Amino acid sequence: MKVLVISDIHANIRALDTILREEADYDLLCCAGDFTDYGISPREVRERFRQLKNTVLVYGNHDRHVINIYESGEWTNVADGKYKWVHYNCERLSEKDIDWMKQLPEKAYFEADGWSYGIAHQYDNGYGTVESRYAFDQYWNASYGAECDGKRRLIFGHTHRQCIHTLGEGMEWINPGSISYRRPDDANRAAGFYVLFW
């Protein structure tokens, strides 16, 4: 089985389509949110995900921000010098697109390859990371319940920084990075994603 793990598309349909072509034989696609904002193709990205099968998707902070700005209507009358990517994205999205994002969960759980997985866009309200087994257990139990006693992996996006962090036997968290936009201090300009095989 092959699981494709991605995050932080930010309305970049070219990057998304490139990854989907390269990894077309995936069995399950997991996306840790941020489908919108900063890019030019929010509707196309939303439509692509609607067409895909076998997905586990959660919303990200930028998706929530786009929803809030869209529903407030403030994107329809933006003062000079205040126009941002969020307004650009709102202009290109329909009520149907917004409804699709609104139905995405904040967190999701699934099982694959003998592991239990929890997926969310971000670990905390900032750019924090899971630093200890205790913090991992606290987060897992609060988010997914304490009854899982086997191998567990958490998937986060948000930071645009790719990593795999092993806290001990059967306890890992991963961040695929962003398929679209790297942080300015990251010399690696390649798209970030992970492929899990078993």
Task: Write out the residue ranges for each language-model feature.
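Conserved beta-sheet core of the metallophosphoesterase superfamily
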Residues: Y134-W198
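Glycine-rich phosphate-binding loop signature in dinucleotide/nucleotide-binding domains
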Residues: E22-Y26, L52, A112-D113, E147-G150, ...
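Core catalytic region of metal-dependent phosphoesterases/phosphodiesterases
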Residues: K2-K102
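Beta-strand-turn-beta hairpins that frame and shape the catalytic cleft
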Residues: M1-L4, Y109-G118, G168-E172
